[in-house]
Amino acid sequence: MYKVLVIIVTYNAHDWIHQCLNSVDMERYDAFVVDNASTDDTLSILHTEYPKAIVRAMDKNMGFGQANNIGLRYALDNGYDYVFLLNQDAWLLPDTIEKLIAAQNQHPEYWVLSPLQMNTAQGGMEKQFGVYCKKNKVQLNLDVPQPVDFVNAALWLISIECIRLVGGFNPIYPHYGEDVDFVQRIQYRRRNVGVVANVIAYHERVMGEESLKKMQYRTKLSLMGILLDINHPFVVAFLLLFFVGVRKIIKGIILGDKVLVNNMLRAIVAILSDVDSVLQYRKISRSIGAYL
């Protein structure tokens, strides 16, 4: 019997927390919840309705990556074999974790495995997850792990070996982008991230319209990810950043999209003004157990 820690990061999770935590078999797995200073009744629900859950209440919002790092450190310190990252807006089927562990045991070169991520409201595969599957030509009729260059961290089974060597999430990413960076660091160690298409779970996120501020933020993180990718020497990463940035600026000019052009220019200037930090984080990311 493997020792599994299910890590859930909550923030104002009233609408999701019951479905999420009710899907975790707490007789078999330990639930570790990090609450990012919720202002609703999330903590009250956790304390009164889920006494078996291990709860850590933060006095400020730590962001996705840093909150998960608290759970990852706990897993290392307490002898767990696996960690399962479970978004507050996601939920499991009874056999989700068990099947993923079986697949990982058969294919230990996969350090992170995701189930097929479905979405009730969308009536099938979660939209963004479907994009990842299509890009990586995931075959839905196979019952073995299939390699992908990325899958979001809403539902991740992570081996403890991965956590020991790769470490935790990079704190340069407060929210969004941290899972991309984590996957890049797995690839740096020549291990795989995969999807097991005959294993199912649900990610019930709702995609809304992005504000201008959020678009600018995500543009910066996207470009930052290119520069922080330790699979490339810094000079190569810098040239890739320049190429991607210039190409998108030209596209924006051709389309008359001033927002795209301004976002790209702002992001590039912000990143280049902090190159020293980027170089430092690239160095740390190569180390064993980084950020933990």
Residue spans of the language-model regions?
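Short, flexible, basic/aromatic active-site loop/helix in glycosyltransferases
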Residues: 115, 130-149
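A conserved acidic beta->alpha catalytic loop
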Residues: 23, 35-44, 60, 90
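Conserved donor NDP-sugar-binding/catalytic core segment of glycosyltransferases
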Residues: 93-126
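Non-catalytic, C-terminal membrane-associated alpha-helical segments of glycosyltransferases
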Residues: 214-221, 231-292
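Short beta-strand-to-loop acidic/aromatic patch adjacent to the donor-nucleotide binding site
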Residues: 80-91
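Short, well-formed alpha-helical segments that are part of the catalytic scaffolds
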Residues: 8-26
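A short, conserved alpha-helix in the catalytic core of glycosyltransferases
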Residues: 150-158, 162-167, 172-200
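Glycine-rich, basic loop-to-helix element that forms the pyrophosphate-binding segment
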Residues: 58-78
